[in-house]
Amino acid sequence: MTGDPGAVVYEVTLEVEAAIADAYRAWLRAHVAQMLALPGFVSARSFSVREPVADGHVAFCVHYVLRDDDALDAYLREHAPQMRADGVARFGTRFRASRRVLRPLD
């Protein structure tokens, strides 16, 4: 992570229809760059998920490292609705997103 005990990981897992996976992946690269420009974001790493996803979808996962809980709370309050709406405007119901927050054990 960052070595900072206050840092948190905001994990976003995306299940995307296989038919739009290439277009979604291209959009996701730009989206991650926009997220990293927001206050409190330190770094991000994107992954493809190895386990198969049911019903013709592929999965991606992004780990965003944020400075601390306050930065995450500010993002969720001030920026998340707009950032999430962009993906929905482009891809509609052709993807699903789930999110969780991870904290270091030590």
Predicted feature residues:
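Beta-strand elements of well-folded, non-transmembrane domains
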Residues: 16-18, 68
